[in-house]
């Protein structure tokens, strides 16, 4: 039975390519040789942006600051439990938010995937903090790609592309996330025996099937 599950998982992952990263949200796992300090050992979520490029944030760089420490005079910020995360090198002084909601939380929010939006505008983020503060994760800065730029980075082998998953976006403990996903991707590549298309998109369903102890708990 396990062998059958593995074969089915491999068929699933071999049917998909990194070209899908152009059309929907994905997780990006930095290659070990990616030495840029901004992205070394990072996991990102990225999705198409209205300008034809892509936009996203780094998921595994928590800071030591709380939202309340950044906005001490803003009482609703004290309700936010999680730390503020470092989202990327674009607009480092700006606050953005990944918001878990079944509809757009306000003006200018970019849909990332089902029930997930990236909010940029201050009035939208204020509304989220005041109404559903712990249904979001807050970041200083973000990552942006020009049209075609992300595909170029994937083709150069800078990223392993995996299915986006809300359980990673809002995972409480992000320490070890990069190593976990990297090891899982290597295990899948080993199972595929060199028959995968290049570049390969690895589906989390296949990762879970091949890795019994793979953790995605929040």
Language-model features: where?
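A short aromatic-anchored loop/beta-hairpin motif
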Residues: 20-210, 214-218
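Sec-dependent signal peptide recognition
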Residues: 3-11
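Hydrophobic h-region of N-terminal signal peptides that target proteins for export
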Residues: 11-20
């Amino acid at each position: 039975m396990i062998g059958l599950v593995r074969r089915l998982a491999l068929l699933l992952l071999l049917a998909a390519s990194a070209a899908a990263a152009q059309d929907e949200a994905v997780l990006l796992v930095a290659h070990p040789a990616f030495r840029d300090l901004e992205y070394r050992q990072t996991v990102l979520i990225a999705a198409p942006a209205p300008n034809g490029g892509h936009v996203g944030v780094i998921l595994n760089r928590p800071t030591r600051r709380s939202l309340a420490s950044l906005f001490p005079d803003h009482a609703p910020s004290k309700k936010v439990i999680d730390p503020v995360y470092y989202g990327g090198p674009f607009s480092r002084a700006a606050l953005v938010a990944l918001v878990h909601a079944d509809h757009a939380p306000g003006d200018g929010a970019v849909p990332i995937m089902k029930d997930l939006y990236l909010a940029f505008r201050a009035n939208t983020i204020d509304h989220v903090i005041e109404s559903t503060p712990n249904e979001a994760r807050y970041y200083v800065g973000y990552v942006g790609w020009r049209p075609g730029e992300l595909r170029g980075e994937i083709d150069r082998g800078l990223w392993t592309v995996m299915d986006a998953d809300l359980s990673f976006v809002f995972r409480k403990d992000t320490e070890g996330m990069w190593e976990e996903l990297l090891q899982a991707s290597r295990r899948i590549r080993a199972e595929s025996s060199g028959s995968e298309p290049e570049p390969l998109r690895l589906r989390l369903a296949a990762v879970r099937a091949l890795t019994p102890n793979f953790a995605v708990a929040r």
